[in-house]
């Protein structure tokens, strides 16, 4: 009721105030050496370009760029805004100092100063204190992030399984709890989170209202009677924890609390009150939870709309999740790329803005005194056609653009959501860790979401740095088919992949790094004198090419010494599977399984251009496929999986349609000093063949056959 009354009062004062502002006008003389910024036509009284802007924000911005160029001025209700769609000017924008173009003035204009403190001029101090205390203690924070992501998964399984819901609130809770555990060393309870959630939702509404409602009115209504009360409730709940740091001067579980309690104003000698410290915490939790949760949600929606990448991320992360291996998870190349791609494609239309103070120019353009903000149109520089100077097909979802050999830029000056320069977000890397953990746990524990794309609602004018995508999704737990198998004092991560006629088994960590080095070097040495080591130099890079083979299935020929080391390895893998057949669903009663004796070996090298078309093996059935080197995008029937270096795929390949659709460029560092003949991935197939079977073709016929791939 109070909110409705407040809105009524706001509307009552709105017309008089905005009419007054509309009637105020000035003439500004442009200096001879500067260009005049073109003003977008079509502004209407009081509302400015608001109506046209709100119909289709992105198309409106594209139309403005097409008509007026890379710099133009528009009016959104009571805000005069200069918009930059120019990469060179974005560099100047990021280099500007606070006293020239102010971020804090913009934030105060959006009501953040009044939102976070009873002292409106304290926002700059609050943000500086947050920056000073955001130190990422990786080994301390990473396990907490993983623990909270696991908790999120458990809640979704136990409380929301089979229900349709908006995922944003659950992700916000995950981020809030994670940030609280890491930065203030506290588990926030439901009472605190309820206040934070109400504070966040109301502040988001107020931020939007600031574009057409004066601050004094918002402060006298929504802030005084509602927003401030939520903030005070949160700071009250923090008092007991703050007092622990006042009592114990050596307590340092939270760097933020420690720094705040120890802070002494250099001019007045005053210390911070509990309320001051609480305000800093509220600011931190609001900023971190809002932006990070939207990015995580956008990533999951983008993965849903691009199912191949959902499957690939699941494949890349499954073993790391099973082992609790956060170090490799946070470094996983494809996971990192999908986070940056969703950030690039899902920015707020004007996430970065500054208030001109001591400057009256940007580049060669004159900035008039009536300009309230200078804003970067981030989508223009990241995903509009304008961005094709940096990004290939910029409006398309293509995470591998950031990976070698393309290496399209993902630094702060290009993927701009966290800002750059003096005002770059200090918690950027921490936020990315949170997003990666949430994505990895959700993708590996739930089926890919299903929804009608037409039901997706997108707000590019949200109160956050990211656009807000809203859709209700159903969390359906996926079948847990990944197993931790202990064999010979070592834990192996094995995934049971069910196919149409049979199954396959993927052992993610069959070979550790040292073994990968040993086995590849062994393969190279036993075939050193073969003609294939010379022929591969002339072979086309788009074709996989053999370097070592023994008792080749097709010809019965060998070009190397008997690879005993490989056959012993295959026997161990077979024993691992048969000893754990019940858990893994391995068909030990199949005669082909019981009689499997590894005696045929085929090792080939792939370049980044190599592919293997979809096929079923015609002359062999069960076997092992070992991967060493760059990751491989492997299609197995209707599933796309990632074969990492050191993995082994086992199955009856005569009953499984399979192909190699992509080779990633990044060969692991631990293999960088080995001879790969300018290729990046080694694949070995080990089979069991009948020694009495006659050869199917000559060696030359075999070489002619593989040249057709």
From Swiss-Prot:
Its cofactor is heme. It is found in: Membrane. Gene3D superfamilies: Alpha-ketoglutarate-dependent dioxygenase AlkB-like, Cytochrome P450. It holds the Pfam family p450. It catalyses: a 14alpha-methyl steroid + 3 reduced [NADPH--hemoprotein reductase] + 3 O2 = a Delta(14) steroid + formate + 3 oxidized [NADPH--hemoprotein reductase] + 4 H2O + 4 H(+). InterPro entries: AlkB-like_sf, CYP450_sterol_14alpha_dmase, Cyt_P450, Cyt_P450_CS, Cyt_P450_E_grp-IV, Cyt_P450_sf. This is Probable lanosterol 14-alpha demethylase. It comes from Acanthamoeba polyphaga mimivirus (APMV).
């Amino acid at each position: 009721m109070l909110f409705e009354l407040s809105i009524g009062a706001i509307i009552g004062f709105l017309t008089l105030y905005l009419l007054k502002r509309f009637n105020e006008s000035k003439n500004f003389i442009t200096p001879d050496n500067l260009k005049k910024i073109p003003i977008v036509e079509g502004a209407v009284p009081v509302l400015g370009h608001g109506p046209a802007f709100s119909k289709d924000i992105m198309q409106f911005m594209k139309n403005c760029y097409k008509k007026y160029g890379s710099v133009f001025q528009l009016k959104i209700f009571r805000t005069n805004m200069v918009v930059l769609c120019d990469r060179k000017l974005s560099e100047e924008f990021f280099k500007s100092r606070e006293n020239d173009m102010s971020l804090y003035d913009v934030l105060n204009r959006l009501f953040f100063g009044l939102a976070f403190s009873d002292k409106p001029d304290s926002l700059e101090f609050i943000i500086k204190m947050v920056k000073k205390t955001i130190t990422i203690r990786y080994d301390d924070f990473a396990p907490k992030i993983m623990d909270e992501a696991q908790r999120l998964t458990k809640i979704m399984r136990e409380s929301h399984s089979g229900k349709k819901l908006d995922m944003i609130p659950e992700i916000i809770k995950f981020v809030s709890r994670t940030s609280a555990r890491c930065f203030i060393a506290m588990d926030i309870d439901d009472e605190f989170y309820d206040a934070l959630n109400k504070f966040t939702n109301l502040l988001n509404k107020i931020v939007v209202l600031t574009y057409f409602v004066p601050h004094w009115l918002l402060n006298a209504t929504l802030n005084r009677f509602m927003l401030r009360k939520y903030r005070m409730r949160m700071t009250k709940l923090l008092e007991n924890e703050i007092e622990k740091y006042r009592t114990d001067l050596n307590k340092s579980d939270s760097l933020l609390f420690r720094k705040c309690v120890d802070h002494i104003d250099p001019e007045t000698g005053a210390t911070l009150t509990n309320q001051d410290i609480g305000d800093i915490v509220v600011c931190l939790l609001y900023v971190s939870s809002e932006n990070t949760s939207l990015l995580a949600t956008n990533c999951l929606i983008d993965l849903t709309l691009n199912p191949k990448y959902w499957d690939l991320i699941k494949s890349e992360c499954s073993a790391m999740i099973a082992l609790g291996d956060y170090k490799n998870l946070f470094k996983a190349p494809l996971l990192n790329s999908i986070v940056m791609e969703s950030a690039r494609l899902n920015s707020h239309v004007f996430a970065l803005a500054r208030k001109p103070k001591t400057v009256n120019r940007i580049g060669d353009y004159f900035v008039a005194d009536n300009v309230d903000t200078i804003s970067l149109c981030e989508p223009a520089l990241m995903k509009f056609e304008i961005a094709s100077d940096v990004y290939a097909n910029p409006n398309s979802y293509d995470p591998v653009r950031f990976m070698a050999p393309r290496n399209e830029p993902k630094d702060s000056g290009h993927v701009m959501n966290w800002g750059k320069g003096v005002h770059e977000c200090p918690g950027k890397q921490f936020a990315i860790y949170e997003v990666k953990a949430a994505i990895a746990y959700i993708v590996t524990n739930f089926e890919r979401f299903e929804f009608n794309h037409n039901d997706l609602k997108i707000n590019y004018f949200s109160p956050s740095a990211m656009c807000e995508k809203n859709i209700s999704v159903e969390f359906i737990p996926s079948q847990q088919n990944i197993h931790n198998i202990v064999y010979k004092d070592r834990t192996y991560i094995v995934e049971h992949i069910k196919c149409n006629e049979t199954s396959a088994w993927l052992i993610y960590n069959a070979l550790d790094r040292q073994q990968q080095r040993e086995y590849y070097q062994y393969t190279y040495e036993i075939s050193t004198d073969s003609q294939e080591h010379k022929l591969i130099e002339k072979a086309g890079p788009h074709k996989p090419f053999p370097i070592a083979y023994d008792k080749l299935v097709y010809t019965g020929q060998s070009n190397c010494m008997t690879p005993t080391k490989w056959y012993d390895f295959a026997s161990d893998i077979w024993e691992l599977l048969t000893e754990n057949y019940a858990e893994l669903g391995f068909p030990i009663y199949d005669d082909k399984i019981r009689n499997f004796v590894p005696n045929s070996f085929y090792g080939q090298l792939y370049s980044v251009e190599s592919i293997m078309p979809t096929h079923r093996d015609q002359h062999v059935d069960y076997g092992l496929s070992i991967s060493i080197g760059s990751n491989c995008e492997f299609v197995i029937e209707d599933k796309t999986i990632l074969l990492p270096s050191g993995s082994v795929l086992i199955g009856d390949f005569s009953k499984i349609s399979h192909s190699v659709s992509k080779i990633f460029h990044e060969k692991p560092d631990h293999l960088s000093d080995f001879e790969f003949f300018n290729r990046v991935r080694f694949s070995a197939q080990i089979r069991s063949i009948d020694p009495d079977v006659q050869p199917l073709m000559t060696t030359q016929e075999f070489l002619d056959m593989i040249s057709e791939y």
